[in-house]
């Protein structure tokens, strides 16, 4: 008898914990997925025999490397870089690069695991990966960021390629960093090829890519509300973060007639009861992308707004969009949101809500969309950037906007297919986990034991 026939969820998770010491976020991500998958595969012997879940929870490979660079004072600095290639059953590895001092191998393994299911959900041929370094771009000069990116790519280039692994941006990696890394890759291999996504539009980037994650999270939110005969118009929203995902989520909420009350960064949050309109969002984008300033400056600029330390979840609103980072919304904060009447939560960030927080939303029957479904618009448009690069064409903003809307609708429908609880409530976590898992698992079955 195959071993997994005798293993229950607790025993399985014990094994995951033992094999991945000191990687709590990875264990948390596997736990969240496994509880749904254990139910789903209970009567499906082929998945047990092939040990599919066990194999998906073990990355294909983890590459770790030294990144040396010289700062402006001529000090030699040493950072650690990684690329986690989790699973390429349905397409080349695909997933962002994160530069943040908190990055560890465990963080990237969790993100690559989530990415595998997310990419599957998009319906596009993309496997899952993630990379990064414990480098802090904050406070560094452009020249320092350039030297770091070049050094990082000097090692990374040998592990990636347009049909092998196609990284993109993530926290701390925006257009500037992608430009420096793409330039270095091209210089080393002497080929122009679509090895990174999120590129500038002058050199092969896709229209709609910068907006796609934030807009997509709002489209998913709109789909959830529509499923219950509701709409975004006239509703208030609390949003965390003030980076790429948060500002574009705020923009789309505003365009659809909602009112955004908060944005944040790691220093605290601003509360603007008048609403953060397009003009103010543009000001925040400039503050963050050009001036590289702090969100607290917003309260100096706009009368009526206030700055507070901590996170924004105590501000009462109908909708919540965590768009900063993992584990930024805990059980108590989820209870506060519920108490204040939140109707729906759509995650722009990856795993921003703790497992306990998710249970609070489910128990209160609040519509709750996990990041792997709600923020998949970014990687979906990255997939479309890969297609455009391969075909040497570029589609316009309008066409890509329509494609993004359709893709998010398709993801929503897959979630409802597997997550409908029969009483009108949809468990989007379960729906996303099962739909994402099934496609990858079936591909792996076709390959045999590899
Ligand atoms: P950015 O670097 O553009 O912005 C990140 C934002 O989150 C900043 O406001 C940052 O504040 C804040 N933040 C980061 N770490 C923390 C922390 N520990 N505590 C509080 N605030 C924090 O990143 P993105 O907007 O691209 O990414 C945000 C989230 O969305 C991440 O979880 C990412 O994985 C996810 N995501 C991004 C995609 C994309 O296309 N960019 C695609 C899918 C998911 P500060 O400036 O102070 O650090």
Place the predicted regions along the sequence by residue.
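Rossmann-like adenosine-cofactor binding region
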Residues: 268-368, 373
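Adenosine-phosphate binding glycine-rich loop
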Residues: 2-29, 224, 338-450
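Predominant activation on well-ordered alpha-helical scaffold segments within soluble catalytic domains
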Residues: 13-14, 31, 35, 105, ...
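Glycine-rich phosphate/diphosphate-binding loop of Rossmann-like nucleotide-binding domains
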Residues: 200, 205-316
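N-terminal ligand-binding/catalytic initiation module
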Residues: 1-207, 439-449
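Active-site nucleophile and cofactor-binding loops and adjacent substrate-binding regions
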Residues: 74, 170-171, 206-213, 238-242, ...
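General beta-strand structural signal in soluble alpha/beta enzymes
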Residues: 110, 164-168, 192-196, 262-265, ...
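Conserved helix-loop functional segments at active or binding sites
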Residues: 187, 222-230, 326, 335, ...
């Amino acid at each position: 008898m195959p071993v997994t026939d005798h293993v229950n969820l607790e025993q399985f998770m014990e094994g995951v914990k033992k094999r991945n010491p000191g990687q709590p976020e990875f264990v948390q991500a596997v736990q969240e997925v496994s509880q749904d998958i254990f139910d789903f595969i209970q009567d499906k012997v082929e998945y047990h025999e092939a040990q599919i879940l066990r194999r998906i929870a073990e990355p294909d490979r983890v590459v770790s490397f030294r990144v040396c660079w010289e700062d402006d004072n001529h000090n030699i600095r040493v950072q650690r870089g990684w690329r986690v290639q989790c699973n390429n059953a349905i397409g080349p590895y695909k997933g962002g690069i994160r530069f943040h001092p908190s990055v560890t191998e465990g963080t990237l393994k969790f993100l690559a695991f989530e990415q595998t299911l997310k990419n599957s959900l998009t319906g596009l041929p993309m496997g899952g990966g993630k990379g990064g370094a414990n480098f802090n771009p904050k406070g560094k000069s452009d020249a320092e960021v350039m030297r770091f990116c070049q050094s990082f790519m000097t090692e990374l280039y040998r592990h990636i390629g347009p049909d092998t692994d196609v990284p993109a941006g993530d926290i701390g990696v925006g257009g500037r960093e992608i430009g420096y890394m793409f330039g270095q890759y091209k210089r080393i291999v002497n080929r122009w090829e679509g090895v990174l996504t999120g590129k500038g539009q002058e050199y092969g980037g896709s229209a709609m890519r910068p907006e796609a994650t934030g807009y997509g999270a709002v489209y998913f939110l709109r789909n959830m509300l529509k499923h219950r005969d509701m709409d975004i118009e006239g509703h208030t929203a609390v949003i965390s973060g003030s980076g790429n995902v948060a500002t574009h989520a705020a923009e789309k909420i505003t365009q659809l007639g909602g009112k955004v009350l908060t944005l944040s960064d790691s220093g605290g949050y601003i509360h603007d009861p008048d609403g953060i309109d397009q003009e103010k969002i543009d000001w925040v984008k400039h503050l963050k992308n050009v001036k590289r300033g702090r969100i607290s400056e917003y309260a100096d600029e706009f009368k009526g707004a206030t700055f507070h330390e901590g996170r924004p979840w105590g501000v009462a609103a109908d909708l919540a969009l965590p768009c900063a980072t993992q584990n930024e919304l805990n059980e108590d904060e989820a209870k506060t949101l519920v108490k204040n009447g939140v109707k729906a939560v759509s995650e722009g960030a990856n795993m921003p809500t703790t497992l306990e927080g998710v249970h609070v939303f489910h128990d209160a029957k609040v519509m709750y969309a996990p990041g792997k479904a709600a923020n998949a618009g970014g990687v979906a448009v990255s997939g479309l950037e890969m297609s455009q690069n391969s075909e040497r064409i570029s589609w316009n903003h309008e066409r890509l906007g329509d494609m993004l809307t359709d893709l998010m609708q398709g993801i929503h429908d897959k979630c409802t297919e597997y997550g409908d609880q029969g009483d009108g409530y949809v468990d989007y976590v379960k729906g996303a986990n099962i739909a994402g898992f099934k496609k990858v698992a079936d591909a792996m079955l076709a390959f045999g034991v590899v």
